[in-house]
From Swiss-Prot:
Disruption phenotype: Reduced fecundity and transgenerational sterility. Increased germ cell apoptosis and hypersensitivity to ultraviolet and ionizing radiation and hydroxyurea-induced replication stress. Increased rad-51 foci in the mitotic and meiotic germline on autosomes, but not on X chromosomes. Chromosome fragmentation defects and unresolved diakinesis chromosomes in meiotic oocytes. Impaired DNA replication in germ cells. Accumulation of brd-1 on chromosomes in mitotic germ cells. In a him-3 mutant background, increased rad-51 foci and chromosome fragmentation. Belongs to the SMC family. SMC6 subfamily. It comes from the Eukaryota. The gene is smc-6. Residues 1026-1038 have a biased composition (Acidic residues). This is Structural maintenance of chromosomes protein 6 homolog smc-6.
Length: 1149
């Protein structure tokens, strides 16, 4: 029974309930398909009751659905009875929106006119499948709608055995209502389950394929599923991004934990350092007493040593004085002897000078005689040569007088000339010379080729040997560097610097070196290039004067450094100011100077002067360097460019010519770097041995083979050359003989033409006789001169002997004098030593006497101060408690000196203070432990979340993969169900056709009027005719429906269409109901609602559809609740089990 609080003339007194009655199922059409009878199962979420207060046209309305016995409910009544209001109230009461019910855009528009508040109470069942365990038998949802807002109250209702209802409020939150609705699978916005009046009319009136497809997607929720998959994928990506972000935060937290642990370690170290400082301070209290004891003991030892020293010094001074007296006596004796020797030397020197003058006179006479002898001898030789020449002329003249003999000789000479000429021509034209020379060229070519091969092998050997030397030098430098880093500039560099430091007082200005020590390479990439450029200056020393340079050379010599290992010394003025106006290239280019950093201005100036490195630019690529420096406009002030492998490109300019020298390549030796100590000596030694083996192999095998082959070719070449030389010699002899014979013949012909000259012969004979007479005279003169020389030599001999005796005497006297002088000097030196030693001994005695009193007073003073210090220690002990583990007094045997201890305490205290500044004392062990546990939990949670996300991602991927199958299965299920429902009527042929690309759903159904014509063949696939949104058919028999417009002119050819245009309004409504019921098949909801579904049906279709709906609800879907609203009469409805009917009266006009 319906109930209300305030009666109204225009309001239902009570909805009238019609009971169940028998229905004759045989009245159905003969070809109606039978439906399977399903088992009735209790399902949670059905509507048990609805109560409305001031909702739309209802002031107070309550309807109770007997869900325990029924699952199909018909609510009938004329227009104005509030059926649609009840429909909307169920949707709104469960949390629906006002715009979803086509009765208003806002919720407040549903409040009854004249009132300010509306209330909807929906009671749902909570028994059977999917029941909520936290609620009782029923769930009541009460929504109160005000003008500004709406509120919810959700109650749990327990039904007692006496049918009493006990309520308890569970929640007042909309979110909890939404969760209950979602749990019961109630789709508030699904048009298939909430087929309102306006939605039914619009759907029946505008049955376009696109609209039907849209209804299909909304009803089956496929589109929402696809979009939810996309949103879920985005949400997963965001979650993974958050996990990554959280992982970064965890990493930061780990760093923070590490810093906290470091702080704890620092705190522990601080405690240890403070304990050590306390121990040192405790021992320092006693250090003063210890120092006084040590000083007193030292003073006593000094007193004993002073007394012993005084006695020994007195004895030494007495000995010194006695020895000095003896030396003075010896010196005086030597002085007397020296005076006598000086007089004898003067006398001997005068006698020697006289003897020398006599000898010189005799030697001058002998030289004059020897000059005369040479003159006479030369004159004699000239006469003898003249005689020989004259005799030869006479002989020649006499031979010319016999002409017959000359004719014979001429004939013989001419015959010989012809024979020799013939032999020469045969040798020149025979071709033997060309063959020999061709053979020689071949041998020389082979020889040069072999020499090239030998040169290549020798070059490889030399390169290997240079590499061996470089590697050995690297090893030596590495070993030297390990001893002292400065040795990278030379193996003796540490010794040199040590000796310079010891001898620095000898220098005017201490030399600076090695220069490489003051140079730092900024860019290590250019180490090899910089070494190529200024590496030879790295071990040089800079001296400010030549005197300092000479002292430094003496140091090199004293250290016995080999000449080849001695550093170069550069002498230059040192003013301590670096050059400023340098001729550098543009700043766009890197230069040798710009990659170096100088720590000394004088070294800076020397490197600039010696290398001009500020004008050497650096270019990595060799080709780029050649193009840049070889162009017509090279960089200004750039003299040349260096590359990474040490190649050099000189700039092309008006005063210079472009040149390029390829670098030898290699690795830097570490002169300007810190990598010298990183040499792997074991690997380097193995490399040296391998290189030596390779060099030995080349020398013993390849080189010897080349030498042997060269020797063979060399012998062949020499043999060929010898053959050529022999041939040339023979040919040359023949030519010489030919020329000689030709000249002899010419001379003989000339002699035959001459006549003998007798006067000439006579004159020559006279000249010969005259000169022969002069020769004996010259010989006699020479004999006289020789006799004179013999006499002078005889007279000079005794004088020479006397001179020798005088020289010997003088030498003997001078030797004795030198011996006396040497002995006298030695005595003088000895005397000076005794004087110096005596002076020192005297000073020592005076000092020892003075120290005697000082030591006595010092001892007394130290003892007094020690007593004061002991008293002070006792007072300090009161303010400085003894640290744990120490003794009183402490053991100071291994404790450092007081000054060193104070310095250490000060350093330790400063270190403690510095560490205290950076130490966070608020970090305790408990903090670290808690933070560590928290971080561990956080990491575990992140790991778990990440695992869950991966599992969700896999599930999502599986669902995305299964989505096409779900879509296809849904389509097949809807199509099959639609075919099954059409078969119930038995007058329709067709089905549903999906086009997912065009997003259309064609309902291809044909009336039974064409069934016979189309029997036995499939329906044609016909063209869809485009229909205006407001065009309808004219064959509807429902006068209440809207008027239809004509679709085509009568004269136009009819087309068979695929939509429902060819059906009547009732048939179209039946097909629509069949489609909606097909959609119900694929979606689950505890209850389904349809309002005015039969608006366009004729009586026959309406009854058929109503009975069909009842049968479907009660037999096919007994576990679902169906609520149908209709303005038509329901008296003709067959009453069956599971059906409950309500009739509502008109409440408004």
């Amino acid at each position: 029974m319906g109930k209300r609080d305030i009666p109204s003339p225009n309001e239902n007194i009570a909805p009238r309930t019609i009971g169940m009655r028998d229905v004759d199922l045989t009245a159905a059409p003969a070809k109606k398909a039978k439906l399977d009878t399903g088992e009735r199962i209790a399902v949670s979420g059905r509507v048990a009751s609805v109560k409305l207060t001031n909702f739309m046209c209802h002031a107070n309305l309550q309807i109770d659905f007997k869900t325990a016995q029924n699952n199909c409910f018909y609510i009938g009544g004329p227009n104005g009875s509030g059926k649609s209001a009840l429909f909307a109230a169920i949707n709104l009461g469960l949390g629906g929106r006002g715009s979803d019910n086509d009765r208003g855009n806002t919720v407040k528009s549903y409040i009854k006119d004249g009132t300010t508040q509306s209330k909807i109470t929906i009671t749902l069942t909570n028994a059977g499948l999917n029941a909520h365990p936290d609620f009782d038998d029923l769930i009541s949802i009460e929504r109160t709608i005000n003008q500004a807002s709406s509120t919810y109250i959700m109650k749990s209702v327990k039904v007692t055995s006496s049918d009493n209802h006990v309520e308890r409020i569970v929640s007042r939150k909309k979110a909890d209502v939404d969760r209950i609705v979602s749990r019961f699978s109630i789709h508030l916005s699904n048009p298939a389950f909430w087929m309102s009046q306006d939605r039914s009319r619009s759907f029946l009136a505008n049955f376009k394929p696109a609209n039907v497809y849209k209804l299909y997607l909304e009803s089956t929720n496929l589109e929402n599923i696809r979009l939810s998959y996309i949103r879920f994928a985005d949400a997963l990506d965001e979650c993974f991004a958050l996990i990554q972000l959280k992982a970064g935060e965890i990493l930061n937290e780990q760093k923070k934990l590490k810093r906290m642990q470091e702080q704890r370690d620092l705190q522990a170290k601080l405690d240890q350092d403070r304990a050590l400082v306390a121990s040192f301070c405790w021992k320092l209290l006693f250090c003063k007493v210890r120092d006084y004891n040590d000083q007193i003991e030292l003073t006593l030892k000094k007193q004993e040593a002073q007394k012993t020293l005084q006695d020994e010094t007195k004895k030494e001074y007495a000995k010194n004085r006695a020895a000095r007296t003896e030396v003075e006596k010896k010196i005086q004796e030597f002085r007397d002897e020296v005076e006598v020797q000086d007089a004898e030397i003067a006398e001997a020197r005068e006698d020697l000078d006289a003897k020398k003058r006599k000898v010189l006179e005799f030697e001058e006479k002998i030289r004059e005689c020897e000059q005369s002898i040479r003159k006479k001898t030369s004159e004699k030789k000239y006469m003898e040569r003249t005689i020989v020449n004259a005799k030869n002329e006479v002989r020649i003249l006499l031979e010319k007088q016999g002409n017959q003999d000359l004719t014979k000789r001429l004939t013989k000479v001419e015959n010989d000339y012809k024979d020799i000429s013939q032999q020469r021509e045969n040798m020149e034209l025979g071709g033997e010379s060309a063959k020999l020379r061709e053979k020689l060229d071949t041998v020389i070519t082979d020889y040069k080729r072999k020499e090239e091969e030998k040169y290549t092998i020798q070059r490889d050997i030399n390169q290997l040997r240079r590499k061996i030397e470089q590697d050995m030098e690297t090893m030596r430098r590495s070993r030297a560097t390990k001893k002292d880093a400065i040795n990278k500039f030379g193996s003796h560099m540490a010794e040199i610097l040590m000796e310079i430091n010891r001898s620095k007082s000898r220098f005017q200005t201490v030399p600076k070196g090695p220069l490489g020590k003051y140079i730092t390479l900024i860019d290590p990439k250019w180490a090899f290039t910089v070494e190529e450029c200024i590496g030879n200056l790295a071990n040089n020393f800079l001296c400010s004067s030549h005197l300092d340079a000479e002292i430094l050379r003496n140091i090199f010599q004293s250290l016995r450094i080999p000449a080849q290992d001695r550093p170069t010394i550069i002498v230059a003025k040192c003013n301590g100011r670096a050059y400023t106006n340098l001729h550098e290239p543009s700043s766009d280019f890197k230069s040798i100077y710009r990659v170096l950093k100088f720590s000394d201005p004088d070294v800076h100036n020397v490197i600039i002067d010696k290398s001009n490195c500020e004008q050497f630019i650096l270019i990595e690529d060799k080709t780029e360097a050649m193009e840049l420096m070889g162009s017509n406009y090279p960089p200004q002030n750039a003299v040349k460019a260096y590359t990474l492998d040490g190649s050099q490109a000189y700039a092309n300019g008006p005063n210079s010519q472009y040149r390029f020298y390829s670098g030898r390549g290699g690795h830097a030796r570490g002169t300007f770097g810190n990598d010298q100590g990183d040499v792997d000596e074991g690997a380097l030694a193995r490399l040296i041995e391998d290189t030596k083996s390779e060099a030995m192999r080349l020398e013993t095998q390849d080189l010897r083979k080349q030498d042997h082959e060269l020797k063979v070719i060399y012998n062949e070449r020499d043999q060929t050359k010898a053959a050529i030389d022999e041939f040339d010699r023979k040919l040359s002899n023949l030519r010489s003989q030919e020329l000689q014979k030709e000249r002899q013949a010419k001379d003989l012909r000339a002699e035959l033409a001459q006549t003998a000259n007798e006067d000439q012969v006579e004159n020559l004979n006279e000249s010969i006789e005259e000169m022969q007479k002069k020769i004996p005279l010259i010989e006699d003169e020479v004999k006289d001169i020789l006799k004179n020389v013999a006499d002078i030599t005889a007279d000079m001999a005794p004088v020479i002997q006397e001179r020798k005796e005088a020289e010997h005497t003088l030498a003997e006297i001078q030797k004795e004098t030198r011996d006396f002088a040497s002995k006298s000097q030695k005595l003088q030196n000895e005397l000076s030593k005794y004087d110096d030693a005596g002076e020192i001994l005297k000073i020592r005695l005076d000092k020892v006497k003075a120290d005697e009193g000082v030591f006595f007073h010092t001892e007394a003073k130290l003892k007094s101060e020690r007593d004061d210090a002991m008293e002070m220690v006792e007072n300090d002990k009161k303010n400085h408690p003894m640290p744990p583990g120490e003794t009183d007094p402490p053991d100071l045997s291994s404790f450092p000196s007081t000054t060193e201890a104070q310095r250490k305490i000060e350093e330790m205290q400063k270190a403690v203070d510095r560490a205290t500044v950076g130490c966070d004392t608020t970090i305790t062990l408990e903090c670290v432990k808690d933070f560590k546990d928290k971080l561990k939990r956080l990491k575990y949670l992140c790991r778990m979340i990440e695992d869950v996300l991966i599992e969700l991602k896999n599930l999502h991927a599986a669902r995305v993969k299964a989505y096409p199958s779900l879509k296809k299965f849904t389509e097949l299920k809807v199509c099959n169900k639609f075919q099954e429902l059409l078969a119930v009527r038995g007058h329709f042929i067709g089905g549903l056709e999906f086009d997912h690309e065009k997003e259309t759903l064609n309902v291809n159904v044909q009336s039974s009027k064409e069934k016979d014509a189309m029997a036995g063949r499939r329906p044609e696939v016909l063209e869809v005719e485009e229909v205006d949104e407001h065009s309808y058919d004219d064959d509807s028999d429902d006068s209440t429906g809207p008027r239809r417009k004509k679709s085509k002119k009568s004269g136009q050819k009819k087309k068979r269409v695929r939509d429902l245009k060819g059906l009547s309004g009732g048939e179209r409504s039946f097909v629509t109901a069949a489609l909606v019921m097909s959609l119900w098949e694929v979606m689950e909801q505890p209850f389904r609602m349809m309002d005015e579904f039969d608006v366009f049906m004729d009586m026959m279709n309406r009854k058929l559809v109503m009975d069909l709906l009842v049968e479907l609800a009660t037999k096919k879907f007994p576990h679902n609740q169906f609520i149908f609203f209709t303005p038509q009469g329901i008296k003709e409805l067959n009453m069956v089990d599971g059906l409950q009917v309500f009739e509502m009266n008109r409440v408004r006009d």
